[in-house]
A protein has these predicted regions:
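Conserved small-residue-rich
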Residues: 78-146, 270-274, 291, 302-305
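Short cysteine/histidine-rich zinc-coordinating motifs and their immediately flanking basic loops
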Residues: 46-51
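N-terminal amphipathic alpha-helical interaction or autoinhibitory segments
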Residues: 19-44
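Positively biased amphipathic helices and basic secretion/translocation or surface-docking motifs
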Residues: 1-4, 53-88, 95-98
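Contiguous mid-protein beta-loop-alpha structural module that forms a pocket-lining wall or clamp
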Residues: 126-127, 159-221
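Short, charge-enriched, intrinsically disordered boundary segments that mark the beginning
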Residues: 1-13
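C-terminal interaction segments
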Residues: 5, 283-334
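Short, contiguous alpha-helical
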Residues: 10, 24, 105-150, 201-256
Length: 334
């Protein structure tokens, strides 16, 4: 029964968007008729979809469900037109803005680590600040007192702690307003609008990457924490649109390849439905093959799967496969 309940709960967003598979159409509605909590959650999702999609015109033909979902993700209020590298961040920000009204009266709900919903938004305010400062955007919180020589992991953790402590002295609405304003400023920056302006490399979080890639990192974190908050509130959050998901995957593969280095036992790594890469040494034969679903791979990189539990397919040298999985899991900073 628990498995059936959890399975239906994961389908409620698709139900609200009218995007259920035919087989699910036979199971979800009967469950909603019997389960008061799922029915209430489903109705909240439906209200959100109506708000995002705007008033319906009865003079226009009904669109396929997949088109409805794509349109919602593209046209959520406040999502600006940006260059392709910033589009995943714009969508993730819009998604979190759409979810946060559901947190009203529930800001103290535990989410992840020792954070509640309020603290999770404060963390995102602190996390986005690093890129914002680099792009000349004014800080929304008191200046950092962390010494310049501190390692990035220490600085990252302490800044989050300081900002959370500061934001606990303010209302959740004030924290959300500052996070939202900072995100909007990032998306209005020249670097978000022009790929050429975002091509130069900068060092953030210990990684020297083009500014364009740092926008994708921001998208990754915003989506992961949106999913965290959704789970805490009992709401299923849809994954990123496919194009955006693949941008996250490709960047994560590049970072994983750098982390493994050129001497690691070579593994042919593939993501279901997409590309494949050789990770590790290019000077010796491939020792193993590893296949992951794109969403599971992102959740592994994001610290929401462990190397032991992430679903995967593998052949060949198990030690080489294990090395890739453990290195991927070790990259999580979220």
């Amino acid at each position: 029964m628990t498995t059936d309940h959890d399975g239906v709960r994961d389908l409620l967003a698709a139900w609200a968007f009218g995007a259920l598979e035919p087989a699910d159409e036979r199971t979800v509605p009967p469950h909603l008729a019997e389960c008061e909590s799922c029915a209430a959650q489903a109705e909240r999702w439906r209200r959100t979809v109506r708000l995002l999609d705007g008033p319906r015109s009865y003079d226009t033909p009904e669109r396929p469900a997949s088109d409805v979902l794509s349109a919602v993700l593209r046209t959520r209020p406040g999502a600006p037109r940006v260059a392709a590298h910033a589009a995943p961040y714009a969508a993730a920000v819009a998604g979190l803005k759409a979810l946060l009204p559901e947190a009203a009266g529930r800001w103290g709900t535990p989410v992840v680590h020792d954070w509640d919903v309020h603290a999770t938004i404060a963390h995102l305010l602190a996390a986005d600040e690093h890129l914002a400062r680099l792009l000349g955007i004014d800080a929304r919180v008191p200046p950092s007192t962390i010494a310049d020589g501190a390692g990035w992991t220490e600085a990252w953790s302490r800044r989050t702690e300081d900002v959370i402590a500061h934001e606990y002295g303010r209302s959740p609405d004030e924290t959300v307003a500052d996070w939202s304003a900072q995100a909007d400023a990032l998306l209005a920056s020249p670097e978000a609008l022009d790929a050429e302006r975002a091509a130069h490399a900068v060092t953030l979080m210990g990684a020297r990457l083009p500014v364009a890639d740092h926008f994708v990192v921001r998208a990754f974190e915003a989506w992961i924490h949106t999913d965290d908050i959704g789970r805490a509130l009992g709401l299923a959050v849809p994954p990123p649109p496919e194009q955006h998901l693949w941008q996250l995957v490709r960047l994560a593969v590049r970072i994983l390849g750098l982390a493994l280095g050129p001497t690691a036992p070579p593994v042919l790594f593939a993501v279901t439905g997409g590309e494949e890469w050789v990770l590790g040494s290019e000077d010796e034969p491939v020792r193993a093959e590893l296949v992951l679903d794109p969403l599971d791979f992102c959740l592994l990189i994001g610290g929401r799967h462990t190397a032991d539990e992430v679903p995967h397919g593998a052949t060949g040298d198990r030690t080489a496969v294990r090395n890739v999985l453990e290195r991927a899991a070790s990259l999580a900073w979220l």
